């Protein structure tokens, strides 16, 4: 077995999988079912990769032994080239499966979108990004819920927070964090000149109660009237909720019609922001040791340009250019996400094996 795939580690993974399977079949404590099922589901494809890889190694050993038998030698000589080609591919596939998983990948996510430079056009583009992510969520069967939305006078957005729930949400959206730049002729531009503006996207993994504990003494809760486009009040009751986390200064707002629901959403958003702060601190602490990552990891980094006159989208982190901007803005993001994920895995694999 290759040095990068020690037999004892593979055996430990298989043993753990078999233990979890026995636990599920034996009727675990109801409070443990979700945790056991999640770990079992995560290990199942890894164990399948291990089984396939070890079967190839066994077939290779058998074929090499057959070379000594004159009657079996022709069959072995026919089989060996196939195995010699299959084993490296299987080993790489298994190495990818063994890469450390981000514990947040399976979590729901919060998407925060804010216009940057560019005035009204930036606010309109921020609205376009929200619609793009909404359509992407619909295409993947996810549930996207608007937590807070402040609209601009021309139909764009001043600020938006949305919650997305579904399978592998954070894993698929985490590379969207950064500055998105747009180049196009604004509808209000009579001279036909191309303007450049930008919007900032932050994708945060949603925190669970067990991730972050917030003492009641650390928060201040205020109620107010929800506001719509231009700042006008959209209802006559103080239903919107603003929560301030005093130690950090973080402020979150939820402005749905139900004040009770707004308290729940605002607290969830606050937990997520604080959880994200903890993750950023941990990332910063590891930065000196980290040799490979997609982009700088800085949310102020320009990650992508959307050029409407050319129908072009360019992701600057991996030098990916696609000439299907209309489809991208309609939520066709899988090709981009897949390319970013593949590059991230390749860099981590190179670091692990190099």
Swiss-Prot record:
A Pfam family per the record: RF-1
Keywords recorded for this protein, A-Z: Cytoplasm, Methylation, Protein biosynthesis
Post-translational modification: Methylated by PrmC. Methylation increases the termination efficiency of RF1.
Main location: cytoplasm
Classification via SMART domains: PCRF
Example of a GO cellular component annotation carried by this entry: cytoplasm
Family annotation (InterPro entries): PCRF, Pep_chain_release_fac_I, Pep_chain_release_fac_I_sf, Prokaryotic/Mito_RF, RF-1
N5-methylglutamine: modified positions: 232
Keyword Protein biosynthesis assigned: yes
Location of the protein in the cell: Cytoplasm
Gene3D superfamilies per the UniProt record, alphabetical: 3.30.160.20, 3.30.70.1660, 6.10.140.1950
GO molecular function, a single term: translation release factor activity, codon specific
Role description: Peptide chain release factor 1 directs the termination of translation in response to the peptide chain termination codons UAG and UAA.
UniProt family annotation: Belongs to the prokaryotic/mitochondrial release factor family.
Name of this chain's protein: Peptide chain release factor 1
């Amino acid at each position: 077995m290759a040095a990068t795939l020690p037999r004892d580690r593979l055996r430990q993974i298989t043993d753990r999988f078999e233990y979890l399977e026995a636990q599920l079949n034996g009727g675990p404590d109801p409070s443990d079912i979700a945790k056991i099922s999640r770990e079992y589901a995560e290990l199942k494809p890894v164990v399948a990769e291990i089984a396939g890889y070890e079967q190839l190694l066994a077939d290779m050993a058998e074929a090499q032994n057959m070379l000594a038998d004159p009657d079996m030698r022709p069959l072995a000589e026919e089989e060996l080239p196939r195995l010699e080609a299959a084993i490296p591919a299987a080993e790489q596939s298994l190495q990818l499966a063994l890469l450390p998983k981000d514990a947040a990948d399976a979590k729901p996510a919060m998407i925060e979108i804010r216009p940057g430079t560019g005035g009204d056009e930036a606010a309109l583009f921020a609205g376009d990004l929200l619609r793009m992510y909404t359509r992407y969520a619909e295409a993947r069967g996810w549930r996207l819920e608007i937590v807070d939305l402040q609209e601009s006078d021309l139909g764009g957005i001043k600020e938006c927070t949305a919650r997305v729930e579904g399978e592998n949400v954070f894993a698929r959206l985490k590379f969207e964090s950064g500055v998105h730049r747009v180049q196009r002729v604004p509808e209000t531009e009579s001279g036909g000149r191309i303007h450049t503006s930008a919007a900032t996207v932050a994708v945060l993994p949603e925190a669970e109660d067990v991730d972050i504990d917030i003492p009641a003494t650390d928060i201040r809760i205020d109620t107010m009237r929800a506001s719509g486009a231009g700042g006008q009040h959209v209802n006559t009751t103080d239903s919107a909720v603003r929560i301030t986390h005093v130690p950090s200064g973080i402020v979150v707002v939820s402005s749905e019609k139900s004040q009770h629901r707004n308290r729940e959403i605002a607290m969830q958003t606050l937990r997520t922001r604080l959880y994200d702060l903890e993750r950023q601190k941990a990332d910063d602490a590891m930065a000196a040791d980290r040799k490979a990552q997609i982009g700088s990891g800085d949310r102020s980094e320009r990650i992508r340009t959307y050029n409407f006159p050319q129908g072009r989208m360019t992701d600057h982190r991996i030098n990916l250019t696609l000439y299907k901007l209309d489809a991208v803005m309609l939520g066709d993001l899988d090709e981009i996400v897949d390319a970013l994920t593949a590059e991230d895995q390749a860099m981590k694999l190179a670091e692990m094996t190099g």
